[in-house]
Amino acid sequence: MKNLIAELLVKLAQKEEEAKELTVQVEALEIVVTALLRHMEHDAQQALIQDIEQAIDQVTPCPPVNDHDAMLLQQYLKKLLRHPRS
């Protein structure tokens, strides 16, 4: 029983480490996207944002994603593109 608990704790620690790594990757990408948007002229920036939003609207995920997850993705993209971090 102790071995099982120890194995579960090791797996949990690995999952936590993976989650931290993904968080760091997402934050790094946010910084890069924000910097790129800030260095673009306004018209080019707006055109890029519209292209991204249209592409997202046209995507049909496979396998299908539930509506809540799709809405979260759209909200996050809107926040990132329309209101980039300071």
Curated annotation (Swiss-Prot):
It comes from the Bacteria. GO terms for cellular component: cytoplasm. It is found in: Cytoplasm. Residues 1-38 form a coiled coil. Keywords: Coiled coil, Cytoplasm, Stress response. GO terms for biological process: cellular response to starvation. It holds the Pfam family Anti-adapt_IraP. Inhibits RpoS proteolysis by regulating RssB activity, thereby increasing the stability of the sigma stress factor RpoS especially during phosphate starvation, but also in stationary phase and during nitrogen starvation. Its effect on RpoS stability is due to its interaction with RssB, which probably blocks the interaction of RssB with RpoS, and the consequent delivery of the RssB-RpoS complex to the ClpXP protein degradation pathway. Belongs to the IraP family. Interacts with RssB. HAMAP family: Anti_adapt_IraP. This is Anti-adapter protein IraP. It comes from Klebsiella pneumoniae subsp. pneumoniae (strain ATCC 700721 / MGH 78578).
